Amino acid sequence: MSQHLPLVAAQPGIWMAEKLSELPSAWSVAHYVELTGEVDSPLLARAVVAGLAQADTLRMRFTEDNGEVWQWVDDALTFELPEIIDLRTNIDPHGTAQALMQADLQQDLRVDSGKPLVFHQLIQVADNRWYWYQRYHHLLVDGFSFPAITRQIANIYCTWLRGEPTPASPFTPFADVVEEYQQYRESEAWQRDAAFWAEQRRQLPPPASLSPAPLPGRSASADILRLKLEFTDGEFRQLATQLSGVQRTDLALALAALWLGRLCNRMDYAAGFIFMRRLGSAALTATGPVLNVLPLGIHIAAQETLPELATRLAAQLKKMRRHQRYDAEQIVRDSGRAAGDEPLFGPVLNIKVFDYQLDIPDVQAQTHTLATGPVNDLELALFPDVHGDLSIEILANKQRYDEPTLIQHAERLKMLIAQFAADPALLCGDVDIMLPGEYAQLAQLNATQVEIPETTLSALVAEQAAKTPDAPALADARYLFSYREMREQVVALANLLRERGVKPGDSVAVALPRSVFLTLALHAIVEAGAAWLPLDTGYPDDRLKMMLEDARPSLLITTDDQLPRFSDVPNLTSLCYNAPLTPQGSAPLQLSQPHHTAYIIFTSGSTGRPKGVMVGQTAIVNRLLWMQNHYPLTGEDVVAQKTPCSFDVSVWEFFWPFIAGAKLVMAEPEAHRDPLAMQQFFAEYGVTTTHFVPSMLAAFVASLTPQTARQSCATLKQVFCSGEALPADLCREWQQLTGAPLHNLYGPTEAAVDVSWYPAFGEELAQVRGSSVPIGYPVWNTGLRILDAMMHPVPPGVAGDLYLTGIQLAQGYLGRPDLTASRFIADPFAPGERMYRTGDVARWLDNGAVEYLGRSDDQLKIRGQRIELGEIDRVMQALPDVEQAVTHACVINQAAATGGDARQLVGYLVSQSGLPLDTSALQAQLRETLPPHMVPVVLLQLPQLPLSANGKLDRKALPLPELKAQAPGRAPKAGSETIIAAAFSSLLGCDVQDADADFFALGGHSLLAMKLAAQLSRQVARQVTPGQVMVASTVAKLATIIDAEEDSTRRMGFETILPLREGNGPTLFCFHPASGFAWQFSVLSRYLDPQWSIIGIQSPRPNGPMQTAANLDEVCEAHLATLLEQQPHGPYYLLGYSLGGTLAQGIAARLRARGEQVAFLGLLDTWPPETQNWQEKEANGLDPEVLAEINREREAFLAAQQGSTSTELFTTIEGNYADAVRLLTTAHSVPFDGKATLFVAERTLQEGMSPERAWSPWIAELDIYRQDCAHVDIISPGTFEKIGPIIRATLNR
């Protein structure tokens, strides 16, 4: 046997990626060479065998020993002659050949699959046409050595054709490469390279992607879109000729880099660049995988030319080539992260100058790529050819890109080359990436011009009041005014304001609770020609004082109890108003003008001082007239006023109804925060139109049951959402509960409430593919622009900055001309007009709607858990004596950073007092507030947070915490605990003396868990798996598993108690269906809040309750005993599916008989046994329909195991289903005097069956949720997307 060699260069990354991936053949590389001409196929087949034998990596074997992976050359391995397949008589030889090759690539071709890692075929598709198929595992070859092997085989074939002896192998033994690599790792060159890449990493800009989806750390897919672009029309050749001082490869790279940057709307981004890592090395003529993908920081200046960019990139690459031997994975590890945690770069660039040409006499050879390994995001292979033309192959991850989008992107690249060919001096920032017709398309989307009357709010309301003077207009719990009465009150108050000195153009502050008087005050202010300034009395006094100082209103309208709060505001005149005034007629005063300010609303400011936004009359008139046209109100409508008046959404609530003859009803103060109060409010007044902020809609939906939804929402005709991104799933839940049309509106305070709209119901909702509903289309006389950093429009699908134009823009910021000028800028596309930058990132969708993509944030994932670092920061900052706080994800234990996900959360704190913080106590407080995966494993106190040169937090400069073992608690016991603690110590590099020490909290990770499991397996003479380390990561817990009886360990998951999730709050008990197992309830973990524990109660065999019980009552009694062992007293939370629901209902009745509280009883398509025909109808023949349904449930459960069902499990399931039929033949229900929640599968509901009637003798109160599914699907993940949130909301009440 040859020498055992470690994996080197690209091999460790490939090995680990394949181990962590579920893809069966992702790391296969394959191509076929199309041979046209006369081919001696038997001779070529023998040449293949001879050529393969000359490349030693093709005879590599791999083994894993004690957590380490080794390779060696198997000298005994021989290659069989490749099969010769003749398809000439086939109807479709080409298609059949392609199918054969793809079938080979679809096999499980992992390195441990037992399939050959090297495979060739010769497929004849015509008399003089052959497909020479070649496939290798990526551990053996890379993109450089693959064609080199093909050329050597062709060389051998041609040599033999000439009758000459076999040429010698040109390939260097891979052992030489390994030895050279190991020497490099110990050399000064390695140290220099490490320092170089550490500096490069610090300066590296964030990665970018052409896909709108977040760029993950590890999501490589072998499902790849391939697009080949041939630039043979001479434009690239013409450009290269004009720029003769620039190498063609450099020019191609600059074009690709600019194309990516403009389509990502990022002028600074990180891409990957493939280096051969062979020059001056033994690897130059070796066949192993040594190519290296290293991060390339791309910086594009808008004012530079393409040759300038090409020259700069070439110089950058020249410097990087001196350090190209350094592993990309090591760069990540050096930065305290692990490969796959987060992306180092986005798209990968590859300049292919490899020689793919085969020189075979009288035979033309063309290579066609089939597989090159998985693609994380996007790869661009650039092929400048000898004729001066350029080919580009684009490989895209199908999970992130679709073919039409990719083709559009390719068209933009062609257009880019054409523009530079026409004008080589064109600046990078001036190149156009919009396709022909897209400017017209965007112009059409923004063609919103509608002529509106030159009028004001007060004029519109007076006009409507004249039409319907006696119609009900305004009401609260105490008062009801008709339109005439309302106008009389408005005019009387407006005259009083004028008496108090209010003049047209002034502002009047309003600090009133929600009532009819708040509405009357706002209307009176407008009637007097002034602007209203709403003050939220829930704000601190200092903040209100700042707003009054900035606005300097001529009057404050408030109440007697609020007036003392404003006593220290100088020169403030006030009016207390809380009762109707004596009418003085209703004739309009006509003091308000279209150019007047209508209202001033203060928003938060980056400086800490709020800023007042001034919105004009014409702006809000446009908004209201559009809304009435788009969502018309009539005299039959009732609009709810429940939005706080300091939130600009309230503006349309206060005025829209009164221009349409509708009625406005005022909710009680603070009622908008109480979903139950809103239910009562909607029902009492018959509300037809209302608004929710999405977060409040979620709370309201959570408060609804089907019954309360019918009672409180029956009159709702249209519901509006704005203020936050609107989750699509929430809309679907609302639609299912109420059926009331939901509409998504978007707009900042700086643009008269809302500037865009999108239906969030029906067909439009069904077509939403993202997580939130699009913000949609512009309203009347309003434009939406999405621009890049150079203020150029971006094409559909490309993210950019959202700007607003048109009539609804605010007049500016009160008393802040500097801020107004910086945010309301000149519109470059409409001379003389203004444009407002929202700060939101958005993109155009194919249907012309705008999709909101959010802003920059600190969201990340660690081992699949999504984490908002900002949320942790805010909780930490609220801790005692903490002035500043920031959370960072990093690898704590550098010695353990050998791959896999090694990151942990670290919290950095700055003390307010400067005294030492009790970090243990603070960490305990965090645990009371945050879910476990968001609690930092270490809190580190710093004198100050590190800042970058531009004054921002420098996360890369945050120090790694010093690795220390936990302060000793209980010492490990002799035996397994001592052995495990010693293994922890040796692998983690710290002295572990605590039985509760956690492997992962001390810096362990999934890759190191493999080594730990291997080491412990040797030491305890029993197999220990990495999975056991994952679920039992402390010394004590792992010892318990290892010391357990072998049969008990083997049967984990097959016992009566199935712990599905452990929390620190109440427990939901889930009862098995007829299968006897509760595994299907694991889906609940996705939906229940973290504090909930979930336990399944099962009936295993032998000797389970279903097998041993004479009747179903005995099963209930047995499970009741099990339940009481787990939880002696209530409240109890029970859930069951099918037969499990029958058991849960019976146990609930028994618990109530014992005086216990049953807080929740959930039934998943469960029916009383009395409603099913279980009795013998004929000679021992049960109801065939019932038996058929039981059989379908059994088959669905077995199918869900995806072929993993063992003989023992199969026998258990079959036996349990037989027992279920036996037990149900004599079953009877027991009355339960509580409330149950029933989910009904509508598709298999028996004709004429009523759940209300069926359960009324046995359950006192029943909530019913009907699901569009069959009985066997009600427990499926798809159905649980609807059921899960309902269960969560019900449990949380």
Curated annotation (Swiss-Prot):
GO terms for molecular function: 2,3-dihydroxybenzoate-serine ligase activity; ATP binding; nucleotidyltransferase activity; phosphopantetheine binding. It catalyses: 3 2,3-dihydroxybenzoate + 3 L-serine + 6 ATP = enterobactin + 6 AMP + 6 diphosphate + 4 H(+); holo-[peptidyl-carrier protein] + L-serine + ATP = L-seryl-[peptidyl-carrier protein] + AMP + diphosphate. Its cofactor is pantetheine 4'-phosphate. Residues 482-887 are annotated as: Adenylatione. Belongs to the ATP-dependent AMP-binding enzyme family. EntF subfamily. Binds 1 phosphopantetheine covalently. Its main location: cytoplasm. Changing residue 1079 to A: Abolishes enterobactin production. It comes from Escherichia coli (strain K12). Residues 1-301 are annotated as: Elongation/condensation. This is Enterobactin synthase component F. Adenylation activity is increased in the presence of the MbtH-like protein YbdZ. 4'-phosphopantetheine is transferred from CoA to a specific serine of apo-EntF by EntD. Holo-EntF so formed is then acylated with seryl-AMP. Induction: Transcriptionally regulated by iron and the fur protein. Residues 971-1046 form the Carrier domain. One of its GO terms (biological process) is amino acid activation for nonribosomal peptide biosynthetic process. It holds the Pfam family Thioesterase. One of its GO terms (cellular component) is cytoplasm. The active site is at 1271 (proton acceptor). Pathway: Siderophore biosynthesis; enterobactin biosynthesis. Residues 1066-1293 are annotated as: Thioesterase. It comes from the Bacteria. The modification O-(pantetheine 4'-phosphoryl)serine is found at residue 1006. Keywords: ATP-binding, Cytoplasm, Enterobactin biosynthesis, Ligase, Multifunctional enzyme, Nucleotide-binding, Phosphopantetheine, Phosphoprotein, Transferase. Modular protein that contains an elongation/condensation domain, an adenylation domain which activates the serine residue into an aminoacyl-AMP ester, a peptidyl carrier protein domain which bears a phosphopantetheinyl arm to attach the activated amino acid and a thioesterase domain. The thioesterase domain is both a cyclotrimerizing lactone synthetase and an elongation catalyst for ester-bond formation between covalently tethered DHB-Ser moieties. Changing residue 1138 to C: 1000-fold decrease in kcat. Releases both enterobactin an linear dimers (DHB-Ser)2. Proteins EntB, EntD, EntE and EntF are the component of the enterobactin synthase. Components probably do not form a stable complex. EntF acts as a catalytic monomer. Interacts with the MbtH-like protein YbdZ. YbdZ binds to the adenylation domain, but does not alter the structure of the domain.
